[in-house]
């Protein structure tokens, strides 16, 4: 089990404090409608309607080498990519969901390509991961403050299993921490209302990350 040590923490944080300047990339299915990563929530789009972007997704011009090169030329020291945002769409080849880039026309593990490109430029590699997943059936729908179906009583939470969801989420975090080599920044997003801390199994999650990966820095958002 991971035990917090201030001296070790400060040492791990040195590069991040010194870096000061990095690139944070929000990119995914929501880039198609181009109305922001929260578009499904803001416009209360049903899953069935949002799926049209999944079937359309085929980013032929995706070139993380250009992103990484631009970051380096600008003097940046690290890059963070949204491996999965709140819509639940994975840019990586997760075995726990069908809602992923490898199942689209594109058929590629986009996180793998990104990681390779960033490392090739000598930059630190970061991945953003959403604790929230609006695609997963066990995540709270009706009455949740953020879910696209929060105002639709047809999406009652009666048969949703929160423990199943937490297990699923932890398993996906394990994947991104073990399948892509050293991850220098792991950025979790986010907590609200009663969805805080141990609701997500936070202690178990952090201990797992420390145990299975070479992750240097774990950052929650508020």
Language model: regions and residue ranges:
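A short, hydrophobic C-terminal helix/tail in secreted or cell-surface proteins
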Residues: 218-222
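Mature catalytic domains of secreted/periplasmic carbohydrate-active enzymes
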Residues: 1-217
């Amino acid at each position: 089990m991971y035990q917090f040590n201030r001296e070790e923490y400060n040492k791990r944080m040195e590069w991040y404090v010194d870096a000061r300047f990095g690139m944070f990339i929000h990119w995914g299915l929501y880039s198609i409608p181009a109305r922001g990563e929260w578009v499904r929530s803001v416009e209360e789009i049903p899953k069935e309607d949002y799926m049209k972007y999944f079937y359309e997704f085929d980013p032929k011009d995706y070139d993380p080498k250009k992103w990484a090169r631009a970051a380096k030329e600008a003097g940046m020291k690290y890059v963070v990519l949204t491996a999965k945002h709140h819509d639940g769409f994975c840019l990586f080849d997760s075995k726990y969901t069908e809602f992923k880039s490898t199942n689209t026309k594109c058929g590629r593990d986009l996180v793998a390509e990104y990681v390779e490109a960033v490392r090739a430029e000598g930059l630190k590699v970061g991945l953003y991961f959403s604790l929230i997943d609006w695609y997963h059936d066990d995540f709270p729908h009706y009455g949740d403050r953020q879910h696209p179906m929060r105002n639709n009583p047809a999406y009652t939470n009666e048969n949703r299993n929160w423990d199943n969801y937490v297990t699923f989420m932890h398993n996906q975090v394990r994947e991104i921490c073990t399948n892509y080599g050293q991850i220098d920044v792991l950025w979790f997003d986010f907590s609200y209302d009663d969805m805080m801390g141990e609701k997500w199994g936070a202690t178990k999650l952090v201990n797992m990350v420390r145990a299975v990966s070479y992750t240097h820095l774990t950052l929650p958002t508020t």
